[in-house]
Regions:
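A glycine-rich phosphate-binding loop feature that marks nucleotide/adenosyl-phosphate handling sites
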Residues: 168-169, 317-320, 374, 417-427, ...
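Long, well-ordered, tryptophan-enriched scaffold segments
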Residues: 273-377
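Extended redox/cofactor-interaction regions of prokaryotic respiratory oxidoreductases
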Residues: 2-7, 182-270, 277, 295, ...
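Long, contiguous, secondary-structure-rich segments that constitute the structural scaffold
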Residues: 566-616, 708-710, 714-725, 729-814
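N-terminal export/assembly segments and adjacent metallocofactor-ligating motifs
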Residues: 2-309, 335, 354, 460, ...
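Active-site phosphate/pyrophosphate-binding segments
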Residues: 333-334, 338-454
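Phosphate/diphosphate-binding loops
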Residues: 507-508, 555-574
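Short beta-alpha connecting loops at secondary-structure transitions
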Residues: 282-288, 548-559
Length: 814
């Protein structure tokens, strides 16, 4: 049964003023505003920091998790124990200057991670079945010997292609401790000294947008910095929620709001869920069915084209395939974008607002109004987060959303954007070299479970294998460093569980982590890692608008229990594997840091000395070019500064995609197209499976965690409870009240969790914050609220990425 959305719900104008006036959502907006004020009060408290005691040390450390920022933490230590945590106290509130980098509630709770009862204390080996969490304590020497001996046997028997480094972002901001990308880690350096490993491409965050927009712009699609919004007249955010996904100290949300105060730009948010980025600050929220963004864009494009609101001069000069004039000779007649939109292409369907309304759930008159506003307001900052791309049709949807910036000529100008996510300034700080991987073969990061189950069957044309036509061997060993993708963050947990439980398939799993995570329970050998507070490192790679920074992450306390640093672990293994000198080059961890810092000072002359930096804790530098404008050089002179696409221009029509579509072997329902068309993909709103599972389930980044990191911190779990968000209309049909325990289920699994009944969800859609720790009962019903019990391992068509937001479910009261 399809959920009918009342016209009153979707047709109503949702503005800042109207939102606050509305009883139900107004209360939510005011509640959200109260939360914002709370964080403001906490931030102002930094100015009056508590005086330190005479026996108290204040040591700079960092939170290095995968939130988009890296935040400085000033640890107050007495007698070798962290007593409390403060954040950056340098700089001011001026976003035009070297502003403070204020840690969010997660970083400020770092002490609770360091002293968490879940901390891994000793090396252990598995004594029960994988996933049971049954281990016995062993010595470090035994752990090293087991790993070295088994790995050497597996390499001898199956080759280095059988060794896999799993995806992990638990400490991706580190330098020595860096966990992502796996190819830039110390584990990769160790394996490269030993003949290499099976690599992977893509990532769980942005696989589809990276691959999709590569065929539009060439390479990773750049975006204007959020500070440039001070030059914008309009801000349109498709599934872009920096208020939660970028809520930390780098300050994307801060830049967004400060810049809008200068420009007074209207902000329109298009999202199935009313996010904290709105929270009464937006001018309009347009709820949309998940996975239908491309249909909306097509409807908008129809209005823009028929009402002459497109920038024809820009399209003629900078683009390929908008109309017949720039269509490649290899393309079929009427194979251009304009023909597709007007119904003159192969499908013969005009993409009118009425057509788009039936798919998206957005009233046609609202689509017309939005098209006219976008088409007549310039410059406009049009961007997309990474939510819309995490769908079965994600690659093609990202190309479609970028079309709004392209059609209106907003690319390469101040106040505009490319349609991609916001960009930022970065420093050329030198990272730990990991040497060259002798193995050229790679798979999608999402298909490692398939590579265990059916590795030799996986091919380039069917499964996206790169570097050779097919895999020769299955994965026989996994290194899982600082990551929870072994089970918790990987889709379709029950299938993964079945594959991993058979230790004759993947014969050795080594997990290196600080806590007993859901993934750690599947280890054969479990190695206790040091936290960032227990070792020295540099922290960087923050998305921070026009200011970049590096943090001196000093050792705050001695390693707890028998924990060791990743450098010490890999150095000891290198010794047993006969590659110690090649691996360490005779340096300790601190000596490597001093060496890398000396190289970095050559690239960044303003850096202070090592000892001065250690004392000051953070180095900040603003972009000397001012606001970052993506593709500015291309816009100014496309001949001298071509893009890296085959044509050197923006490719609306991609011949490369046409060639892939003609040669790849795709399952029924998967579509790769040279144009940014709308295709529903599998498990969409229009899928016949909707009759059995009538609700779309989507995920979102929850503010109490960074993916699954901090998911075991009690105060954060209490402050931001894990709940399933559901619209009152859907809840009423099912007899569900706020706080009721519900079961969410489909053919892949079942989750029991409390319901949050709220008008902040679009009818027909439910949502779970991703990253909650998997907690199954004896029947494998999850009680932790882990969305990946319900997600699918069927990959997206082009990137072979994770379609985590493409799910059909049913919900019932328990």
């Amino acid at each position: 049964m399809k959920t009918k959305i009342p016209d009153a719900v979707l047709a109503a104008e949702v503005s800042r003023r109207g939102l606050v006036k509305t009883t139900a959502i107004g209360g939510l907006a005011m509640a959200s505003s109260a939360l914002t004020l709370l964080f403001s009060r906490i931030a102002h408290a930094v100015d009056s920091a508590i005086p330190t005691k005479s026996d108290e040390k204040v040591i700079w450390s960092a939170c290095t998790v995968n939130c988009g920022s890296r935040c400085p933490l000033r640890m107050h230590v007495v007698d070798g124990e962290i007593k409390y945590v403060e954040t950056d106290n340098t700089g001011d509130d001026n976003y035009d200057g070297l502003h403070q980098v204020r840690a969010c509630l997660r970083g400020r709770s770092m002490r609770r991670r360091v002293y968490n009862p879940d901390r891994l204390k000793y090396p252990m080996k598995r004594v029960g079945a994988r996933g049971e969490g049954k281990f016995e304590r062993i010595s470090w020497e035994e752990a090293y010997d087991i790993i070295a001996t088994k790995m050497q046997r597996l390499i001898k028997e199956y080759g280095n292609e059988s060794i896999y480094l799993n995806y992990g972002t638990g400490t991706l901001g580190g330098t020595m401790t860096r966990s992502w990308p796996p190819g830039n880690t110390l584990v990769a350096r160790l394996m490269n000294c030993c003949g290499g490993y099976l690599n992977h491409y893509g990532d769980y965050s942005s696989a589809q947008i990276a691959e999709g927009l590569n065929y539009t712009y060439g390479g990773w699609a750049d975006g204007n910095s959020p500070s440039d919004i001070e030059n914008s007249k309009l801000v349109v955010l498709f599934g872009n929620n920096p208020g939660e996904t970028r809520m930390s100290g780098g300050g994307v949300t801060y830049y967004l709001e400060q810049a809008r105060q200068k420009s007074n730009a209207r902000m329109i948010i298009i999202d199935p869920r009313y996010t904290d980025t709105g929270a009464g600050r937006e001018d309009e929220w347009i709820p949309i069915r998940p996975g239908t963004d491309a249909a909306l864009v097509n409807g908008l494009a129809y209005v823009m084209i028929t009402e002459n609101l497109v920038d024809q001069e820009f399209l003629d000069k900078y683009c390929v395939g908008y109309d017949e004039k720039t269509l490649p000779a290899s393309a079929p007649k009427n194979g251009h974008y304009k023909a597709y939109i007007l119904g003159e292409g192969p499908d013969g369907v005009a993409k009118t607002p009425e057509w788009a309304s039936q798919i998206t759930g957005i009233p046609a008159d609202k689509i017309i109004k939005l098209a006219r506003e976008i088409g007549s307001t310039k410059p406009a900052f049009i961007s997309q987060g990474w939510g819309p791309q995490r769908h079965a049709n994600g690659e093609i949807a990202t190309r479609a959303i970028s079309m709004l910036a392209i059609l209106t000529g907003n690319v390469g100008i101040n106040g505009g954007n490319s349609g991609a996510r916001e960009g930022s300034y970065s420093l050329p700080f030198v990272r730990m070299p990991t040497l060259e991987n002798p193995i050229q073969t790679s798979i999608s990061m999402f298909m490692w479970t398939d590579a265990i189950e059916r590795g030799p069957e996986m091919t380039a044309l069917r499964d996206g294998v790169r570097g050779k036509d097919k895999l020769d061997v299955p994965i026989k060993m996994i290194w899982n460093y600082a990551g929870n993708c072994l089970i918790n963050q990987h889709s379709e947990i029950n299938r993964t569980h079945e594959i991993l439980q058979d230790d004759k398939k993947c014969e050795l799993i080594v997990v290196i982590d600080c806590h007993m995570t859901s993934s750690a329970k599947y280890a054969d050998i479990l190695l206790p890692d040091c936290t960032a507070s227990e070792q020295m490192d540099f922290a960087l790679d923050a998305s921070c608008g026009n200011m970049s920074y590096v943090i001196f992450n000093d050792q705050v306390i001695k390693p707890r229990f028998e924990c060791k640093t990743i450098y010490e672990m890999t150095s000891e293994l290198a010794k047993r594997l006969g590659v110690e000198q090649q691996f360490t080059e005779g340096r300790t961890q601190e000596e490597w840091m001093r060496h890398l810092y000396a190289q970095s000072r050559e690239a960044i002359p303003e850096l202070p000395t090592f000892e001065e930096f250690r004392k000051q804790g953070i180095f900040k530098k603003r972009d000397p070019q001012g606001h970052h404008v993506a593709y500015k050089a291309f816009r100014e002179d496309p001949q001298a500064n071509p893009l890296t696409t085959p044509s050197g221009k923006i490719e609306i029509y991609s011949q490369a995609l046409a060639d892939i579509a003609a040669t790849w072997e795709l399952p029924e329902g998967d579509v790769i197209d040279p144009l940014p068309i709308y295709t529903p993909g599998f498990e969409s709103y229009q899928d016949p499976l909707n009759k059995q599972y009538p609700l779309q389930l989507t995920g979102f980044h929850y503010k109490s965690r960074v993916h699954s990191t901090y998911g075991n911190v009690d105060v954060l779990k209490a402050a931001c409870r894990q709940e399933m968000w559901i619209n009152p209309l859907d809840a009423q049909k099912r007899g569900i009240s706020n706080g009721d325990k519900v079961r969410i289920f489909n053919d892949r699994g079942e989750v029991h969790i409390e319901a949050k009944v709220t008008p902040r969800m679009m009818p027909g859609v439910v949502a779970l914050g991703e990253g909650a720790w998997y907690d199954p009962d004896t029947k494998r019903v999850d009680k932790g609220g882990c969305i990946n019990v319900l997600t699918t391992q069927r990959p997206s068509p082009l990137a072979k990425g994770n379609p985590s937001h493409t799910n059909l479910v049913q919900v019932e009261k328990v």
